[in-house]
Amino acid sequence: MIDIKLLREHPELFRELVRIRNSDINVDELINIDQQLREQQQKTEALQSELNNLSRQKMIEEAKQVKEQLAQQEPVLKELQDKRKQILDRVPNFLAPDTPVGESDAQNLEVFRWGEQPKFDFTPKTHEELGKKLGILDIERGAKVSGSGFYYWVGDGARLQNAAFRYVEDLLTERGFVPFKTPVVTKSDALYATGYFPFSQDETYCINNSDMVLIGTSEQSLVPYRMNETIEESSLPLLYTAFTPCFRYEAGAAGRATRGIFRVHQFHKQEQIVLCKPEESEYWNLVCQKNVEDIMQGLEIPYRVVLVCTGDMGAPGFKKYDTEGWFAGFGEYRETHSNSNLIDYQARRANIKFNGKSKGFVHTISSTALTDRALIAIIENNQTKEGYVKIPKVLQKYMGGQTEIRPAQHKDVERVDVSYLKDRLNGLQYESIGDGNPETLAFFKK
């Protein structure tokens, strides 16, 4: 949400903003509605003041008339308030001065690369092929149970995922981030507060007959954690991280790297969230980016960083970096992380303020730390000629020292003594279904 006072004082800035953002917002219509609303508010305030100041003699004679006028004002005010809010809610955020101008991700500006793309003396397999061969990724049964866009991590696949997210959470907590286990269901207000509503409603799983939704990122549960609060300035910054399942419709994603599990309806994500003072948001945006790159380097995934252009940035974003990992199966860089400075856009919608030597709305940073996509890159980039997958060194300690994923072998499970558990019933006095009915007892014994 933007500052309405700024709109009144500098409408030309907003006309230019919606032009650059390719937004369909009519700034002049918004200004006109705002002016009408303010005039009607003044009229209502004058009537209320008149009602309050009526003498006893005139009260009986005139109060009824003034109250009728006030009653007539209510629907007028509400209609104008609703119209203004409907437009205001869709006004995009300002943009950082160094944001590239462009229409799509093709115009994003590459700013850095790290790592060498793996070279193979064989044709590399895709993560779907490797996952099926190794028995670590089951897309077919995911579709059987839940439909397309769902999947199972199995065996060492599940262990690899656990290892990767444990590694990332350990790294972030060592750097001062507080870990959370958040709800995965929130009120729709939480998505409005974070700027996902009204822009991304078609991407959201809404629960029937309720005001509840499934989160598409823990940003939607972590930022509203401080909704309608005023934070002591001395407590800032607040550094939060959470690992959650995430749910997205991915409407209109056909043809956009939908092969395998790159673009799905449910995935897992570790998020970085920062609430800070306005003058520090650029710094924390860069800190989150450093964390992203340290994670990618630790996982040995070659990557590039791009500065996102105007046409590829969501409405709440002020400045955004995307990090794209190399995927040997795709043969190209693909997005694995997004890292956005949202300045005060979310805080105004969520009403998160700070107070101290200075006061105002906090700034927020939202950055991916890890998603399942990184596992795809690990599987595709670290494959061997035999079809095995080498485990990155930083993850080996989380997998009991295992260095490689090979096809799962059936293992006989050692039988343990459980007779003492059955023996607990001996000597207990109670009525069972077989008491007094030999036929029933004989049937159940079979």
Which residue ranges define each predicted feature?
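N-terminal alpha-helical targeting/anchoring segments
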Residues: 1-118, 132, 136
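Short alpha-helical functional segments enriched in proximate histidine and acidic residues
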Residues: 40, 87, 171, 295-299, ...
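Conserved anionic group-binding/transfer micro-motifs
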Residues: 7, 33, 164, 387, ...
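Hydrophobic alpha-helical packing residues
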Residues: 14, 54, 84, 168, ...
